[in-house]
Amino acid sequence: MSAGEVERLVELSGGTGGDEEEEWLYGGPWDVHVHSDLAKDLDENEVERPEEENASANPPSGIEEEAAENGVAKPKVTETEDDSDSDSDDDEDDVHVTIGDIKTGAPQYGSYGTAPVNLNIKAGGRVYGNTGTKVKGVDLDAPGSINGVPLLEVDLDSFEDKPWRKPGADLSDYFNYGFNEDTWKAYCEKQKRIRMGLEVIPVTSTTNKITVQQGRTGNSEKEAALPSTKAEFTSPPSLFKTGLPPSRRLPGAIDVIGQTITISRVEGRRRANENSNIQVLSDRSATEVDNNFSKPPPFFPPGAPPTHLPPPPFLPPPPTVSTAPPLIPPPGFPPPPGAPPPSLIPTIESGHSSGYDSRSARAFPYGNVAFPHLTSSAPSWPSLVDTTKQWDYYARREKDRDRDRERDRDRERERDRDRERERTRERERERDHSPTPSVFNSDEERYRYREYAERGYERHRASREKEERHRERRHREKEETRHKSSRSNSRRRHESEEGDSHRRHKHKKSKRSKEGKEAGSEPVPEQESTEAAPAE
């Protein structure tokens, strides 16, 4: 089908507009829908490029583009009185139809080099933020929408087909940031409540700043001048963002949806000679500090002490290493020997120690408000730590240990004395039974002395055994006499005394006879020697 046939169709539809049959058949002006297949049949030799450019640059008023529901623009040809009356071929050649599918948001180029048409069709819905400046192309900051409905107002239950519930489906293809169906519903509900004003947002969150300072500060003057903070993310309450793509996200930025918190970071310099300590500082105005500490703030549970508030002023400050009272023994270790230090024992007159309690307590700085200590109700350090009982206990324990040591020493001394006595007795016995060394004149006399010593030892042992036997016998007889019943006590006593005296006399007599025999046997060799001398 050539371009001339198309022009004839347009001419016939315009020239016979008054015919009743054609009006009844075609309904008067009718739309000419030309498909993309006709563009391939156009003869390039019949139509010249300059005419196409003029036609595309100055389109007639009868051609209009209207956007359908699917976003495809359709060319609509309407007849006018001027076109219907003109019969010249030049006027017909000026009409040119551009055929093709136009997609939303992308530049379209005609088949014959016509000017591109860029249609940015946006569905109507709630507009967030400022709408004064219109952005060409796709607005990446605009909230998403599904079929013209804002993303947060879409009801997931309205979908008949839920592909994320199918087996093997990946939830990350349908929900971002780790959401699933249930958490997404809860998130949308919370955002809806925040927009309606039902969700309570803390008022102090607009002025809270969280600053993290790395490195230790040098002195108190430098601590007062904090480095300037860099605000990396600020979410105004009138603007609602669902989050930027990773390519356009600022480094270190945090997206907080529905919150109005300013999060900043302090970049501190690390000194070479100091340790790397991390210090978290909270900036808060002095007017926001509640000076009434009788009750905790309303956002703390009852019974839990607030963590960000300073300690109550009625407690004494904890002792530091430099100001603590000296010589307090740590738990589990005995104190140093000697009397306790006088600073630990409170006197009766004062009731306070002179060293620790006289110093002025430093006030607790918190923001711009300082909390002084109540010195009148603060008890003294010695009254808190009563060490007199501890010292008494330690002194008593030391005395007990000394007594035990003295007893052990006395026992050792008694044992040594007993040993010395035994040794002296043995020496005296040996001296009594042994002759003087001046008697030793010959080997024979030495031999004789040795025999005498041995005999004397045997004699001493035999006499000792006899004494033990007599003692046992007497003991047995005494036991027997006690159990006898036919004699009187006087007679028994008399007989026992007589028996004892008789035994003693007998024992002495036997002892004397033995000694006489030994003495008589010793001078026998001397008599023999004297008898042998005259015989010679």
Swiss-Prot record:
Modified residues (Phosphotyrosine): Y366
Full protein name: Pre-mRNA 3'-end-processing factor FIP1
Gene this protein is translated from: Fip1l1
Biased composition (Acidic residues): 43-54, 80-94
Arg/Asp/Glu-rich domain: region residues: 397-432
Cellular compartment(s): Nucleus
This protein's record includes keyword Cell membrane: no
Entry-annotated residues carrying Phosphoserine: S84, S86, S88, S434, S438, S442, S496
